[in-house]
């Protein structure tokens, strides 16, 4: 057992305090998303996401004057603006939005006036994610390159009958189970801003994304998977396409993957994210991405940031002498700066919390979204010298006067001597001498992390008087490559023990926790672990697996990506006897051991973890006589998005816990 950090203190109760956070408050919470500084560094355009309606969150775009902190809306209300990017001259903003029934590329003055629809943009329901920039300006501001699906009929898989020929035949999670991959490919188009004339630069059976226009104006960087069967091998490489005639040259040809390329200011060097291992899946990988650079012709590829943690997309300083990048670190996401010439690394933003979207100005100013344990993401700015300055107070009307639970961090030595860090949220209003329930809230991935960021679910539970424990079990990121690799071939193994050991440690460290009122929940892989844990122990009074896997064999063949387990176990199920191993590591195999009342939560349109995983476990639990209920949310994919559903599941969860915590 090791050190403990106090990450936040109780928000003081002000006059007229309203208690802690309530489920209905989710309708009022807002968060800063995408952040982009103007070329002069004096203004920032940023998105604000809010959930004031019953449906999915919506976003608005605003422009902030950095010096004064004054903000104004950009674009028409309800236009669905996204991807806003400044022109190189700083006099216009390009963005994606709607004009009537059409969705496309729009250019406007920086005050939102003179908005003009330049080109229609089409999408695809192809399931695997793309990364990086969707649009990029030419240096002279006369053209914009963007990503769009090529026009054309959809695939026969949406007809009657539905004819399936692709390996990845299912769509994104939100499309539903009766619609299939439309087979539209994403390609690069260039629009002339003045006339709206559009040229298609790339074609074929591939997908392009992650754009960056060269400083000389002659080429556009992009990322694409050009394997003979892109559905089977997600090997992303970096290419450049000539803006004048669409001639493509390949810059990398590795067995690993490259992402987010960006030109240096002089156009001689390209920085990007890369991995080293042979890659088979982009849905999840235990290998951390690191920052690399190469010459503009693709030669002299080298890893420049040799820090043992997962790094985010790099940006160049204006003089080209430094690279900035984010990196996960023990539950946090910090911003760093490195000089490729001497390798020296300096921390730029180091506060406990998470740096989200960020943008670098010419004079070293950084504008960024930042969340801590006490607030969702707000807009901040930091000059080259001096400390951070907060520019927005989006949630003052919700959080002022609310009592939030403070958050501790502690590290425990788990099985095999592995150190595992956990974060514990206290009850918002603890009662002296009283015991409180504890909910183990398990993150998904498994290659992800939890940390000192605002967690609305944890704070709602804290307001009810619960403690909430989040464990960065082996397999989590933010603790080095060896820690992320430690789950390889061992799902539902030692990482489940990490959670139980962390609970044991919490019971010793915090005497206010009631060992007789423990709950467990998690989403996706966290839901899988919740399912597994109730087959291993009866110590939990109630369980709430969300979007959970119960049968690793059926999951492998029904999810929209079919090689995730091949990555995690080193073989496909039909190889090396893995089918038997997967069944042996499936919670469904041991359902007769379950005694814990279980509420299964799932989106009906989930193609990531199909709802059949919840259906199997639900019927099996009923067969063995366990108190169980399945809550199915229509229109939802992998994870709930509609605000009314988020509120509903929190209210249901608390009722479920309260019901079973009272049973002795």
Q: Where on the chain are the PLM-derived regions?
A:
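A short helix->beta-strand "capping" segment at the edge of beta-propeller domains
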Residues: 18-30, 198-200
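Structural motif
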Residues: 55-60, 101-106, 154-156, 185-187, ...
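Conserved beta-propeller blade repeats
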Residues: 30-45, 76-96, 102, 121-147, ...
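Predominantly five- to eight-bladed beta-propeller fold
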Residues: 146-191, 236, 275-276, 283-290, ...
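Cap/lid segment of the alpha/beta-hydrolase catalytic domain
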Residues: 227-228, 394-516, 521-523, 555-562
């Amino acid at each position: 057992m090791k050190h403990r950090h106090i990450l936040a203190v109780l928000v003081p109760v002000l006059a007229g305090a309203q208690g802690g956070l309530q489920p209905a408050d989710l309708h009022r919470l807002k968060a800063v998303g995408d952040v982009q500084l103007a070329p002069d560094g004096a203004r920032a355009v940023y998105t604000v996401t809010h959930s004031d309606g019953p449906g999915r969150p919506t976003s608005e775009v605003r422009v902030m004057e950095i010096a004064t902190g004054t903000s104004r809306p950009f674009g028409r209300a309800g236009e669905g603006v996204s991807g806003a990017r400044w022109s190189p001259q700083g006099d216009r903003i390009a963005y994606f939005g709607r004009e009537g029934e059409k969705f496309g590329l729009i250019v406007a003055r920086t005050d939102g006036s003179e908005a003009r629809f330049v080109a229609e943009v089409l999408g695809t329901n192809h399931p695997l994610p793309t990364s990086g920039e969707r649009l990029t300006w030419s240096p002279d501001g006369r053209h914009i390159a963007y990503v769009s699906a090529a026009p054309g009929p959809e695939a026969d898989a949406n007809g009657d009958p539905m004819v399936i020929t692709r390996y990845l035949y299912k769509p994104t999670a939100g499309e539903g189970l009766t619609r299939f991959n439309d087979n539209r490919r994403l390609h690069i188009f260039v629009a002339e801003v003045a006339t709206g004339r559009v040229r298609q630069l790339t074609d074929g059976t591939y997908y392009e994304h992650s754009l960056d226009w060269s400083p000389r104006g002659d080429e556009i960087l992009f990322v694409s998977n050009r394997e003979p069967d892109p559905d089977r091998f997600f090997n992303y490489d970096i290419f450049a396409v000539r803006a004048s005639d669409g001639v493509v040259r390949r810059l990398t040809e590795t067995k690993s993957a490259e992402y987010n390329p960006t030109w240096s200011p002089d156009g001689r060097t390209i920085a990007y994210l890369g991995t080293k291992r042979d890659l088979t899946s982009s849905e999840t990988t235990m290998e951390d991405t690191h920052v690399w650079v190469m010459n503009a012709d693709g030669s002299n590829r080298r890893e420049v940031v040799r820090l043992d943690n997962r790094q985010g997309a790099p940006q160049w300083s204006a003089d080209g002498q430094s690279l900035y990048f984010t990196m996960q670190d023990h539950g946090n996401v910090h911003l760093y700066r490195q000089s490729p010439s001497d390798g020296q690394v300096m921390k730029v933003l180091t506060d406990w919390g998470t740096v989200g979207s960020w943008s670098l100005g010419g004079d070293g100013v950084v504008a960024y979204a930042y969340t801590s344990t006490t607030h969702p993401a707000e807009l901040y700015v930091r000059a080259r010298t001096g400390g951070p300055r907060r520019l927005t107070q989006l949630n003052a009307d919700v959080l002022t006067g609310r009592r939030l639970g403070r958050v501790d961090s502690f590290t425990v030595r788990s099985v095999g001597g592995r150190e595992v860090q956990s974060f514990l949220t206290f009850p918002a209003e603890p009662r002296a001498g009283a015991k409180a329930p504890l909910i183990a809230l398990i993150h998904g991935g498994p290659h992800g992390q939890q940390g000192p960021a605002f967690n609305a679910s944890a704070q709602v539970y804290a307001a009810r008087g619960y403690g909430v424990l989040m464990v960065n079990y082996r397999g989590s990121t933010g603790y080095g490559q060896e820690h992320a690799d430690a789950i390889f071939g061992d799902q539902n193994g030692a990482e489940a023990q990490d959670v139980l050991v962390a609970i044991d440690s919490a019971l010793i460290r915090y005497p206010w926790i009631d060992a007789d009122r423990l709950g467990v929940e998690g989403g996706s892989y966290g839901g899988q672990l919740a399912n597994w844990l109730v087959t291993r122990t009866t110590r939990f009074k109630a369980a709430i697996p969300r979007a959970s896997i119960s049968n690793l064999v059926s999951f492998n063949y029904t999810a929209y990506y079919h090689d995730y387990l091949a990555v995690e176990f080193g073989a496909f199920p039909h190889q090396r006897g893995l089918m038997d191993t997967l069944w042996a590591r499936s919670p469904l195999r041991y359902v007769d051991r379950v005694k814990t009342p279980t509420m299964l939560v799932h989106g009906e349109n989930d193609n990531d973890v199909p709802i059949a995983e919840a259906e199997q476990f639900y019927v099996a639990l009923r067969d063995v006589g366990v108190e169980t209920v399945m809550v199915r949310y229509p229109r939802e994919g992998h994870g709930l998005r509609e605000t009314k559903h988020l509120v509903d599941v929190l209210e249901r969860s608390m009722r479920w816990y309260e019901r079973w915590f009272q049973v002795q």
